[in-house]
Amino acid sequence: MRKRIVSVLLILALFHQSFMTASAESETSLTREEIDNVLWGYTIDPSIPTFGEYKSANPSNRPDKAYNIDAADFSRYLEGDEAAEPEIMSGYMGMDGDSVLTSENSVIEYEIYIEEAGLYDISLLYYPVEGKSSAIQRSFFVSGVLPYRELALIEFARIWQNAIAKQVTEPGYVALVWEKDNQGNDLKPRMFESPEWINSYLRDVDGYITSRLPVYFEAGLNTLTIAALREPMLLRGISLDNPPPPVAYADYKAAHDKAGAEPVSGVSVELQGQYAIRTSSQMLYPVQDSSSPALTPVSPRLLLNNTIGGHSWRFSGQWVEWDFSVPESGYYSIGLNVRQNFRRGAYTSRKISINGEVPFLEMEDYLFAYSQNWRNETLSDSDNEPFLFYIEAGVINTLRFETVLGSFAEVISEVRESIYELNSIYRKIIRLTGVKPDRYRDYQIERSLPELKGEMEAVRDRIEQAINEIRRIDTRGGGQERVLVAMRDLLNTLINNPERFARVLETYKASVRACGTWLNEAMLQPLQLDAVQISAPDVEHKLRNNSIFHRIWFELSRLFFSFFIDYSRIGNVSDSDEGDTITLWVGSGRDQANVIKSLIDERFTYDTGINVNVMLVDMSTLLQATLAGQGPDVALQVAGDLPMNFGLRNAVTDLSRFEDLPEIRERFDPSAMVPFEFNGATYALPETQSFPMLFYRKDILAELGLEVPRTWDDVKIAMAVLANDMMEFGMLPNELLFATLLFQNGGEYYNEDASRSALDSEEGINAFKIYTEFYTDYKLDRSTSVEERFRTGEAPMIIADYTTYNNFQVSAPDLRGMWGFAPVPATIQPDGTLNGVAASHSGACIIMEMSNKEASWEFLKWWTSTETQVMFGREMESLMGSAARVPTANLEAFSMLPWPAADYAALREQFSRIRGIPQVPGGYFSFRNVNNAFYSVTTPFEELPARARIERSPREELTDKVILINDEIRYKRSIFGLPLYGE
């Protein structure tokens, strides 16, 4: 973590300039720490250009000469900041020569002598060795300098395949046979990594730049430094070259005509989408779709794997491949059974390649229009004339469809930059007016901010350019530009009269937020594919079984079967007399339940012989169902306060009865067990665990000259600086925040035997006083979403659950590289040491008392194991993206999730000092009354009813509420026959 942002930026600027002027005649002395400093601040360092700026500043010549560098010919290798010797592998997986294994914390450097200066494309020949199953990430420096921002993060794909029961060779392709559950439904196949040697050029990770990313090399000796950010990689070689771009279709066709190519006749090969042989992502597995009788295969009763893609095939760079062969060499047309019903009024784009090459320019960015229903689309030009593809017979051909932003890439890039500038303008305005300006006051905005009009005009022009480009691309008039038009019109109004900001500030903020939503949606390019038909030009491409009669009969059949199918049951369903059988309740969504069930069937039942019936239910009915004898054996995703309360009512099993519990406890941080233990009993195992972190905006802190705070005293200093600029520290009042302050100040929730509250101790009262002062003395917002204010910059530092990281990764592409996170601020102790403890909360998995206990315990041990939690976490990310990253409580599994190394280090630092909040009988009254006391102290007089307008100190309020807490604890302990305080 970098402590002084301004200092870092000065160092970065000097560092960058020094290497710009240094001779490239020797290897650089670039250290890992220096690399990390550059990567930490590259988005806010003005000395590091964007790709567009870099291209404009350098000559555009592209020499013909190519350079190939063996990976083993490196000049320097570091592990962290220490020089090391990497592992060298010879002849690995059929590859001749020596390859170098680079770790996820490595730096490897090469010296390259360039004969002719110019732009060169860089490609890596690599093998994706086993890691955390996420994309490999690297950054690239040339002669000690990060050439431009896009090279700070380059991703290299892994290759995935479906695990199948068997495969059957059909004419021209390979069909897959799926495992089935005992209801006849296809099981979703497990994806497994199928690594192979890959040659990959450097490309923009966001897809905003559709071309390869070239680098300008000076003539003479240069150094190329590759810094690992995530995942290991086996590197065989590096190439610098300039391959020719694809030619236009007319030239492609003319060249093959000249070579004697002719259309074939009467030939057709159909590739089923679900039989994709390779994909770039775990997310791209077969999809079960029963929406149309035109799909192949399809059933009104059963769930069959019959398509691929949809919402899971939406991110730039994701690709799917099929292998096929044709009986004759010649020209073929390609038809697709597709549906793009995800982005109304918009196109989605795919790059189509055959045998690793884009056949002609038009396939770099092929557009698929919106359609509510399945349709057959033949790849055609703007005049609906089918494209003809020359395909060789007698070889295995590979067809790849890759998601690209295509024509929209430049538009999206412009809008992203515009949003950043619009938020910057918003922050300038609120520094003058505050977030709630007086609409009748003249703030003299134009005089105070003379540069504002020019900035708004520049953003308006950029948005206008984006609008025009959208209209050029979208000739159907889908209306994709409406949000941008509204923003442009508002800017025109404000340019004419900047004083109107005082009246329309909320409208401006909402319009910027709408642009952010538009950006998120525009970046997604979903497409669902049923089949690919590679046919002779004289063979008609069409949907089968798609008449009105077929559709009516199919829908009536679906309706009929819906009366007999129990949709709450997932996968295999076993009777109680089929050996050991347990019932599992899952309280999350169907996607999660399907993943859990598939893991159970593939692993747990197969290994143990214990059958598990999975049911998707509302967990609020758990206690009632158990008391009625209709409950499950095991329940997952249970709230952390339930196990102890259920245990006292003899509704769940005390796990301390199992001899191997101490061994299982070692999987978790001790804090994760705290909520589930009471009076010597253990009522649950932790399933998830999360805790707060400090999120901060690098760009805004740099503007203000602020450090990332280490202590709460630092936070208070930062608050004063933020207040001067009408910004604030974002921190919503909640139990985790209060408990964090309580623990850091030496307080406890309860006394040693949990028979009374300890919140009225001096430590507890002091913690409560500090807690309330943030909202009385520093006027922090108590209700507005901190995430939204973080994005706009109103709150450039926030305290939020660490899972917020996942949300920002997905929902804030405009802030990529401009934010970071760190452990929560610490409290300075009397001896000068820092107490940085953070409170955590845990989700639980429990065994009900009326259960098959031994079988249920076997399941719980399996479910919380490292292997299972890693598989579940990766499956969820493959299904729903990084926003669904599971906050697993298993420490080893947590370390194996695909966190970038720097982010994991920050999380691990906080994970090493967390504490759980204990649960006791009547404990639900504790924070409820703390919260009541909090609002009594912090609510302004004018918001209180007249009878309640009595000024109360934090000490008085909390002391009064502790009396109520103790009364409730005493009452509950008497009900359960537990010793009472003082008796």
Regions found by a protein language model. Give the residues of each.
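Conserved N-terminal structural module of periplasmic/extracytoplasmic solute-binding proteins
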Residues: 25-26, 330, 411-416, 420-644, ...
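Glycine-centered hinge/linker elements that transmit conformational signals in sensory
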Residues: 753-783, 824
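Extracytoplasmic "Venus flytrap"/periplasmic binding protein-like
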Residues: 600-671, 675, 699-707, 796-797, ...
